[in-house]
From Swiss-Prot:
SUPFAM superfamilies: Ribosomal protein S8. HAMAP family: Ribosomal_uS8_A. It holds the Pfam family Ribosomal_S8. Keywords: Ribonucleoprotein, Ribosomal protein, RNA-binding, rRNA-binding. Part of the 30S ribosomal subunit. This is Small ribosomal subunit protein uS8. The gene is rps8. Belongs to the universal ribosomal protein uS8 family. NCBIfam families: PRK04034.1. Coiled coil: none annotated. GO terms for cellular component: ribonucleoprotein complex; ribosome. GO terms for biological process: translation. One of its GO terms (molecular function) is structural constituent of ribosome. It comes from Methanosphaera stadtmanae (strain ATCC 43021 / DSM 3091 / JCM 11832 / MCB-3).
Length: 130
């Protein structure tokens, strides 16, 4: 089976395991982008610890789930957003103001839309989590 979008598959795996009430999940294949998204989700307390395990191929992430995710998904197409336009996409992808995060890739790295707003930079939308 070939994967068309590993990031979308990883988030679907996390969401399905959260809905089943599992304590952990395995994400494969691993990538730098998935690692950065997971670390951003960890900073915002949506997931627990995660570790990269070398399986001789692309690698595997073992992720601890804490039960804080109601829904998460990938944003397609990956819209380019100015720092003044984040509020429009908050209304579109998040259920309420100040509830959930948008994860954005910027020239300074992967961060939440709140951090990007504070830094005054734009980027491309990757993920919504609430």
């Amino acid at each position: 089976m070939s994967l068309m979008d590993p990031l979308a598959d990883a988030l679907t795996n996390i969401r399905n395991n959260e809905l089943q009430g599992n304590d952990s999940c395995v994400i494969k294949p691993a990538s730098k982008l998935i690692g950065h998204v997971l670390s951003t989700m960890q900073k915002e307390n949506y997931i627990g610890n995660f570790e990269l395990v070398d399986d001789g191929k692309a690698g595997i992430f073992n992720v601890e789930l804490v039960g804080n995710i109601n829904k998460c998904g990938v944003i397609k197409p990956r819209h380019a957003v100015k720092n003044t336009e984040f509020e429009d996409y908050e209304k579109r992808y998040l259920p309420a103001k100040n509830f959930g995060i948008l994860i954005v890739t910027t020239p300074q790295g992967v961060m939440t839309h709140h951090e990007a707003k504070e830094a005054g930079i734009g980027g491309r939308l990757l993920v919504y989590v609430y």
